[in-house]
Regions:
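Gly/Thr-rich phosphate-binding beta-strand-loop-beta motif of the actin/hexokinase/Hsp70
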Residues: 25-52, 167-168
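Hydrophobic alpha-helix feature that most strongly marks membrane-spanning transmembrane helices
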Residues: 43, 47-50, 66, 129-136
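Composition- and surface-driven signal marking solvent-exposed, interaction-prone regions
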Residues: 48-60, 136-143
Length: 168
């Protein structure tokens, strides 16, 4: 109730706000957009391609409560590839284990911060893979086609995410 006194606008959950921002950027700039919101338990990926908005939630990839899922699904080698120091695998696993048993702690050393950044990169990578798998055109729909469409190999159910449209 106190928060409502601070604003004249309705308060909306973070995913709704981020989704609105992504849609507005795509609309105002007439571009394709990808955005992410990584939290403690989930990672949300938002995209607009060809004016079509999609949001996916990777419920098992976050930076605190589900950090063990990030490690399990990405593997220690994928996490290690982002680290530029000489942490041995045992030390790395111990530091990640500490984060698993104390998920809300904040990194206290530069090495701990780099490890969390490496895990964040992997959470984003895994979540984006899922997003591309779920952000697809409708399957099984009948499309009106011309004879020239016969030579176009696109099928229903393919991903809507086109990285070449992002102009990175």
């Amino acid at each position: 109730d106190k928060l409502l006194t601070w604003t004249d606008h309705p308060i909306i959950p973070t995913p709704g706000a981020v989704g609105t921002i992504i849609k507005k950027i795509a609309e105002n700039e007439n571009i394709s957009v990808v955005g992410v919101d990584i939290g403690g338990a989930t990672t949300d990926v938002f995209s607009v391609f060809n004016k079509q908005f999609n949001r996916t939630v990777s419920a098992n990839y976050g930076m605190s409560y589900s950090i063990c899922n990030v490690l399990a699904d990405s593997g220690i080698d994928n996490v290690s590839r982002w680290l530029y120091n000489d942490l041995n695998e045992k030390d790395l696993m111990n530091r990640i284990a500490n984060k698993m048993i104390r998920p809300t702690t904040i990194p206290q050393t530069l090495d701990d911060l780099k490890i969390e950044q490496a895990l964040a990169r992997e959470a984003l990578r895994l979540s984006f893979i899922q997003h591309k798998e779920f952000a697809v055109s409708l399957k099984g729909i009948q499309k009106k086609r011309t004879i020239s469409d016969t030579f176009d190999q696109t099928m229903s159910g393919e991903t809507l995410v086109d990285m070449m449209e992002l102009n990175l």
